[in-house]
Amino acid sequence: MIEINKIYNEDCLDTLKRIPDNSIDLVITSPPYNMNLRIRNGKYCSRQIVKEFSTKYEGFNDNLPIEEYYEFHLKVLKELLRTSYIIFYNIQIVTGSKRAIFKIIGELSDYLKDIIIWDKGYAQPAMAQKVFNRRSELILIFDAKNAISRQFEKANFNRGTLDDIWQIKRGKKVTNSHSAVFPEELVKTIIENFSNEGDLIYDPFMGTGTTAVVAKKLNRNFLGSELTQQYFEVIKSRLEDETYKLFNKKNI
């Protein structure tokens, strides 16, 4: 078994190779959105202007060709389905992701349990004319064992208390180079309602570490992968700070 309560500074596919089957209780993640791919004259091309506003990755411009982006997600999701029970996969439908994401939904339809609409309450004005402002994102829920049923085997909410549209404000920036930070409230809602204390939570695209920080606060074990060294250092700092807070709280 891979060492838990640890973040690995590597590609998530390398981490997943070392994770045994059915050993992750819950996955919460938000992969890159392929923000820097656009359409010009009916063809996909790299979009330079957005790079000033989008998340910065080491050695990765977030502009994969659609087929490569699709293959990447498919490979990751198949590994997550092998290792995990329930997967919450947050993605925004943008030009560079749209075709790939809907193709993935079709390819993995046997494992798609439900979809949550995350309403962030505010949308940046669109950068082009005649385009919707994007206020919402999708959270695709995959179930490796019993996706055909709408019931969740491990659920801590009562009948009629949880909707499929979640109104949660976007997360606050932890570092200037990462624009798409998970809000703690979103992660907390998922962890509290779909896992128990002591469960193992995995985030293959850890970003600035919100999944690990919230898991620690809620007495869950965590595991994460993050390829970008800068974000890896941010995660370490946040987890050290959270350990200090928890230690002091226990000794008051």
Annotated model-derived regions:
Residues 1-3, 236-252:
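Short, conserved SAM-binding/catalytic segment
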Residues 2-234:
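Core catalytic lobe of class I
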